[in-house]
Swiss-Prot record:
The lineage of its organism: Bacteria, Bacillati, Bacillota, Bacilli, Bacillales. This is Elongation factor G. One of its GO terms (molecular function) is GTPase activity. It comes from Bacillus anthracis (strain CDC 684 / NRRL 3495). Its main location: cytoplasm. Coiled coil: none annotated. GTP binds at residues 17-24, 81-85, 135-138.
């Protein structure tokens, strides 16, 4: 099957925004106008094409980035709709990594919102060119120029309107095109009746002023255009378009357009802008990778002639075909039924079928080419971030980095039947989502799930119920404490049972002392003269290791201590490995009174980004959570507070930050180190664990 669309005519774009800015609706309209769907689904009615998981339709938010393909004016546009909620940033990270360009959707009333800033930062990290679509122009309080102002103030981005709205709110009925110097008026609500007219008299002055600003901004980035501009020569529409395209694809300039996706206004013009200004796979730098054995850096150009290389960016479990692996082809061609190498894992994989996805319907294709996004069926070992490549020409592409989970809860199946299904469900869900982990707690036997936030884990439990029919009870969030010793001491452990029959006898003297942080447990044998026979010494070490798993104060694992076996005695007949194991654990218990044991807690490095006016409240809040503020800096017109806060005090923080800053603050946290718990808190923990 020959290539249907050339590489120049391919666009891989993402639609990104703050929750509720209307990006799913915008994607819906794109699919409607490009002829992919015949009836438009409304998000608020729960019938949207892109939001196809049940929870998404109920909550009216997008959780997984659905990938879909559309066609417009001889071009193929692959679209990935991303979620806007902060707990799902991993989805946004994944999709940005494989896109060439993006459309940032803003709400015309609010302009740039907190999650917009987070997503914008991620897009800047990956160097993704962007167009800004100011949506909801029909909404009460919509203000286009205010929204453009927020892009400058909150994102420090070089963004300029290439359109102006005609009217706003109920009166929004047209768009002025500053590049082509014309206007588009809308006759009906389906947006199909569009008339291209001259710019209305009353808007001419404003349009001229903004066109002048646009030309000046583009000319600043293009020497040839600058010369013409300074000499007062006329700059043609073609030159201006080429200048905007060049500046946008090099991520130096961001065109701003407007519309109302819900009222079907401005969507076709948005599609035109995607084609005119966002890059094709040929316009972005060639992807870099390394050769597995030599670590030599190589490039893969976007071309069908190059060896095959692709990045798996998402795994999904589909009710009909099983495991789907979404991948972006960077170079070469792939046929269904062929073999590829997963160079990240060093495994050979067979690509059974290749599907082109459209929200939740699919079409089977036999070949994918450079620049395409598709889904493969039949890959067994591939997970998110893995590279798939030609077996004869190995390469590992730069993968994505995912943060460690910060919150965990215990989860229990409601019945025996649920228990059997729960293991399968958890392993499939952790395959799909690299920031979600599940493990069994050795001490309690409970299943613990960990993720990026409270909403994240809610959704996971919800998906277990719906997709895997597993009912489960969820416990309260838990913190992983540790214990350690602060003082050194020599203690005795003696186990003797010698009443009738064969007895048990083990006797040890052990010196305990604190070890450096992060060094774990170290055991040393200092026995001289055979007072404890050599065959029993490993048993002493093993006995201590077992006893350390359930600490001495509150039952948490003991970390970072040294133990040296210095003396002891044995009995020819009654001594055994078991007896020495028990003697060692008795010595550890005896150490409690002498070694000054303490509880350690995980400390999180927290970064809070807030508008300046909330600074006082946030600093007070951090201190009340036993946090230490370690630094502050201005970022644009926002303030960044960096602090070290105990994880146990961070539960519910997202909600409290939201209410303290009217939703304008965002925060991120990562684990940093373990630190001693203050005495008052330590007493509370011990009481709680002893059930007092």
């Amino acid at each position: 099957m020959a290539r249907e669309f050339s590489l120049e005519n391919t666009r891989n774009i993402g639609i990104m925004a703050h929750i509720d800015a209307g990006k799913t609706t915008a994607t819906e309209r794109i699919l409607y106008y490009t002829g992919r769907i015949h009836k438009i689904g409304e998000t608020h009615e729960g019938a949207s094409q892109m939001d196809w998981m049940e929870q998404e339709q109920e909550r009216g938010i997008t959780i997984t980035s659905a990938a879909t393909t559309a066609q417009w004016k001889g071009h193929r546009v692959n679209i990935i709709d991303t979620p806007g909620h902060v707990d799902f940033t991993v989805e946004v990270e994944r999709s940005l990594r494989v896109l060439d360009g993006a459309v940032a959707v803003l709400d015309a009333q609010s302009g740039v919102e907190p999650q917009t800033e987070t997503v914008w930062r991620q897009a800047t990290t990956y160097g993704v060119p962007r167009i800004v679509f100011v949506n909801k122009m029909d909404k009460i309080g919509a203000d286009f120029l205010y929204s453009v102002g927020t892009i400058h103030d909150r994102l420090q981005a070089n963004a300029h309107p290439i359109q102006l709205p005609i009217g706003a709110e109920d009166e929004f009925n047209g768009i002025i095109d500053l590049v082509e110097e014309c206007a588009y008026m809308y006759g009906n609500d389906l947006g199909t009746d569009i008339q291209r007219v001259e710019i209305p008299e009353e808007h001419k002055e404003l349009a001229e002023e903004y066109r002048g600003k646009l030309i000046e901004a583009v000319a600043e980035l293009d020497e040839e255009m600058m010369m013409k501009y300074l000499e007062g020569e006329e700059i043609t529409v073609e030159e201006l378009k080429a200048g905007i395209r060049k500046a946008t694809t090099s991520v130096e300039f961001f065109p701003v357009i407007c519309g109302s996706a819900f009222k079907n206004k401005g969507v076709q013009i948005l599609l035109d802008a995607v084609i005119d200004y966002l890059p094709s796979p040929l316009d972005v730098p060639a992807i870099k990778g390394i050769v597995p054995d030599t670590d030599e850096e190589v490039e893969r150009k976007s071309s069908d002639e190059e060896p095959f290389a692709a990045l798996a960016f998402k795994i999904m479990t589909d009710p009909y075909v099983g495991k789907l692996t979404f991948f972006r082809v960077y170079s070469g061609v792939l046929n269904s039924g062929s073999y590829v190498k997963n160079s990240t894992k060093g495994k050979r994989e067979r690509v059974g079928r290749i599907l082109q996805m459209h929200a939740n319907s699919r079409e089977e294709i036999s070949t994918v080419y450079a620049g395409d996004i598709a889904a493969a069926v039949g890959l067994k070992d591939t997970t998110t971030g893995d590279t798939l490549c030609d077996e004869k020409s190995l390469v590992i592409l730069e993968s994505m980095e995912f943060p460690e989970p910060v919150i965990s809860v215990a989860i229990e199946p409601k019945s025996k039947a649920d228990q059997d299904k729960m293991g399968t469900a958890l392993s499939k869900l952790s395959e799909e989502d690299p920031t979600f982990r599940a493990h069994t707690d050795q001490e309690t036997g409970q299943t613990i799930i960990a993720g990026m936030g409270e909403l994240h884990l809610d959704i996971i439990v919800d998906r277990m119920r719906r997709e895997f029919k597993v009912e489960a009870n969820v416990g309260a969030p838990q913190v992983a404490y540790r214990e350690t010793f602060r003082a050194a001491a020599k203690v005795e452990g003696k186990f003797a049972r010698q009443s009738g029959g064969r007895g048990q006898f083990g006797h040890v003297w052990i010196e305990f002392e604190p070890n450096e942080e992060g060094k774990g447990f170290e055991f040393e044998n200092k026995i001289v003269g055979g007072v404890v026979p050599r065959e029993y010494i490993p048993a002493v070490g093993a006995g201590l290791e077992d006893a350390l798993k359930n600490g001495v104060l509150a039952g948490y694992p003991v970390a970072d201590i040294k133990a040296a076996l210095v003396d002891g005695s044995y009995h020819d007949v009654d001594s055994s490995e078991m007896a020495f194991k028990i003697a060692a654990s008795m010595a550890l218990k005896a150490a409690v009174s002498k070694c000054n044991p303490v509880i350690l807690e995980p400390m999180m490095k927290v970064e809070v980004v807030i508008p300046e006016e909330y600074m006082g409240d946030i600093m007070g809040d951090v201190t009340s959570r036993r946090g230490r503020v370690e630094g502050m800096e201005a970022r644009g017109n926002a303030q960044v507070v960096r602090a070290m806060v105990p994880l146990s005090e961070m539960f519910g923080y997202a909600t409290s930050l939201r209410s303290n800053t009217q939703g304008r603050g965002t925060f991120s946290m990562v684990f940093d180190h373990y630190e001693e718990v203050p005495k008052s808190v330590s007493e509370e923990i011990i009481k709680k664990n002893k059930g007092e």
